[in-house]
Design a protein with these regions (language model features):
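Short amphipathic alpha-helical interaction segments
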Residues: 148-163
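Long, highly charged amphipathic alpha-helices
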Residues: 42, 154-157, 186, 190
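A short, conserved structural fragment
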Residues: 163-173
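C-terminal scaffold of the Radical SAM
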Residues: 1-149, 206
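Short, conserved phosphate/pyrophosphate- and ester-handling motifs at nucleotide-, phospho-/glycolipid
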Residues: 177
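Residue-level detector of family-conserved "landmark" positions at structurally sensitive sites
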Residues: 11, 57, 154, 171-172
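Non-catalytic, well-ordered alpha-helical scaffold segments
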Residues: 123-127, 156, 181-185
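Short, amphipathic alpha-helical interaction segments positioned at domain boundaries
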Residues: 181-207
Length: 207
């Protein structure tokens, strides 16, 4: 990709649902993640040496322009389309994965939501932390603005863990270190793998 002199490159980890993973292993071989960190380190070394900067744990760009489907600029967001998800006021919503059902909902002026769950306070805080870690920076000021409290008070255990292992540094604004890039990549991969499992379940049952 470097020979093409492209401005942005995104490297996605394997996020297969259980059935997809089984199908891949039948066709190719057992999915082996033992060398995943080594490959990720090769990617980091290669892009950094060529002047790219990390925008997320997956996306690297040169210059100011950057497009990433996984970047979240707002704390709440609404997903549009079949199979999309939303988070609004601490509630997690899932749209129907069935195109006919989606069309039926919309034609009747109904929301296509087929499931929702109120996140616990801890889940909401940890989800916020995960998305900020993925974007490589956790701003304590924005956290106070959002949750009306100090991040070290609400997420002290999590932050001490991250700092102890050298995955983040800083005080009010925490930056993900190079050592922390791979663990953050894994955490986000597991989050989307879980979503893909939900997607597979709903599609199979035309929910």
């Amino acid at each position: 990709f470097k020979t093409l002199r492209i401005d942005q490159a995104t490297f996605y980890p394997l996020m297969a649902s259980p059935h997809k993973k089984s199908a891949m292993e039948r066709k190719f071989n057992r999915v082996d993640t033992s060398r995943e960190k080594r490959f990720y380190d090769i990617i980091l070394r290669s892009v950094y040496n060529d002047g790219y900067k990390a925008s997320t744990a997956w996306c690297f760009s040169r210059g100011d322009r950057m497009i990433d489907e996984y970047i979240i600029d707002y704390d709440d967001y609404v997903g549009i389309g079949a199979g999309s998800v939303s988070i609004v006021n601490g509630n997690f919503y899932v749209n129907t994965f069935s195109l006919p059902r989606y069309d039926e909902f919309i034609s009747q002026d109904k929301l296509p939501i087929i499931g929702w769950r109120k996140l616990t306070d801890r889940e909401n805080l940890r989800y916020y932390l995960l998305t900020r870690l993925f974007g490589l920076s956790v701003d304590g000021g924005k956290f106070r603005e959002r949750f009306k409290t100090d991040i070290h008070h609400k997420l002290g255990t999590e932050l001490r863990f991250l700092k102890f292992f050298g995955l983040v540094d800083g005080q009010d604004t925490l930056g993900v270190t190079r050592k922390g890039m791979f663990p953050v990549n894994i955490m986000m991969r597991e989050f989307f793998t879980a979503l893909n499992s939900l997607r597979e379940y709903c599609i199979e049952r035309q929910i």
